[in-house]
Amino acid sequence: MSGYVGRLAPSPTGALHLGNVRTFAIAWLRARSLGGKMIMRMEDLDHPRDKPGAAAQAIDDLRWLGFDWDEEFVQSERRPFYRTVLAKLDAYPCVCSRRDVESAQSAPHSGEQLFYPGTCRGRFRSWEEAAEACAPRIPCWRFRVPPDTTVSFDDAFAGHVTQDVSATLGDFPLARDPDGAGYTLAATADDLDMGVTEVVRGDDLLPATPPQILIARAIGREPPSYCHVPLVVGPDGRRLAKRHGDTRIAAFRAAGVSPEKVIGWIAYTCGLSADDYPVSLADLVGRFSLAAIPHTAVVISSLPFA
């Protein structure tokens, strides 16, 4: 086995669908084609949005499709670890809502990221004091970004990326949790702790990368490499959702669609097959090439396998 370590990181906030399974397939094939190790990490920290049974269903769907992995972790079981990581960061509690941040902006910023002007810097002595001030809302932890902080990295798929984080994002949120158990901090800390060498994920998460690189370096570690691939979208160009029809893997299973048929569609959209004929995930390992994957989103205008 090579030194490559990848990871699959489903979230139980919803059912697996063609979009996230395609991204997982690219991540899995990338690792296995390089003789690497694969980690399964259930990212179940967003409790208000978690769906009952979704975690078990995701594992079952992935195994049905032919995925396997070498280690398995559950984020909700790792809260003490996130607390230790939070203690190493220059972070402070913030009570600002999204509307507060939007109204504080003096000029628009590109993309979906909001620039935070540091309103709560030095305002509260503790999380508890901030929580009392904004009750019943919950404060968040923010990472204090030093002036003139620019992050640059070479993405295996998206190419060279540079962002002046201090000028475009400011002090970014880490977690809306007293222990720091939230996506931005937890995903970064876990990737480092689990030895992940490359993060393969959808390009909707490209904006999350500069903050995660800053977190890694703040605790004295070098971040993994990154590879952000295009999403599967509906005709409106937006990520797959209920409005685009039922693309859940569970729905295809119930309709009698074979796992090889689903993987065949993924292979075709990734440039690994000339047609969407059925094929197993394992059979794609030898032919996988990151260079074959189109640099444009996959648009679903009608449901496959109908």
Show where each model-derived region lies.
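Short, mixed-charge aromatic SLiMs
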Residues: D46-A56, G234-R238, G286-P294
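Active-site cores that bind ATP or allylic diphosphates and position pyrophosphate for catalysis
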Residues: D100-A241, R248-R253, S302-A306
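Short, surface-exposed acidic
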Residues: D70-E71, P223-Y226, S273-V279
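Alpha-helical structural motif
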Residues: A54, V85, A208-P211, G245, ...
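Non-catalytic terminal extensions that flank enzyme cores
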Residues: M1-A15, S33, M38, L65, ...
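Alpha-helix initiation and N-capping motif
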Residues: A55, R79, R98-V101, Q113, ...
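Short, structured secondary-structure boundary patches
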Residues: Q57-F67, A87-P93, G111-C120, G245-A251, ...
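N-terminal Rossmann-like or analogous alpha/beta NTP/dinucleotide-binding catalytic cores
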Residues: M1-E112, D203-D204, A208-R221
